Amino acid sequence: MACEKPVKVRDPTTGKEVELVPIKVWQLAPKGRKGVKIGLFKSPETGKYFRAKVPDDYPICS
C-alpha cells in the first residue's frame, strides 16, 4: 500500500516547513507502550532522506 496523504513536516536540511508525502511509514514503540508513527521523507531541495513523526491516524504503508 502506497502512502498518498501529504503531511506538513519540518525539513531538517533546509529548516523550512514543507508538505510532503512520506515514502514509508512505520510504528516505533517500546514493549507494551503506545509509541509513535515515523515517516521517511525525501527533501525536495537537497535530495537527502530524513525521518519525522507523522500523525497517529496516518496509515502504516511501505
From Swiss-Prot:
Q: Which domain of life is it from?
A: Archaea
Q: What does this protein do?
A: A chromatin protein, binds double-stranded DNA without sequence specificity. Constrains negative DNA supercoils.
TM region positions: none
Modification note:
Methylated at multiple sites, to varying extents.
Keywords of this entry: Chromosome, Cytoplasm, DNA-binding, Methylation
- Single GO molecular function: double-stranded DNA binding
Q: How does it assemble?
A: Monomer.
Q: Which Pfam families match?
A: Cren7 (PF11520)
What HAMAP family has UniProt attached to this entry?
A: Chromatin_Cren7
Query: Where does the protein end up?
Result: Chromosome; Cytoplasm
Instruction: Specify the species.
Output: Hyperthermus butylicus (strain DSM 5456 / JCM 9403 / PLM1-5)
A GO CC annotation given for this chain: cytoplasm
Name of the molecule in the record: Chromatin protein Cren7 1
Q: Per the similarity annotation, which family is this? A: Belongs to the Cren7 family.
Q: Does the keyword Oxidoreductase apply?
A: no
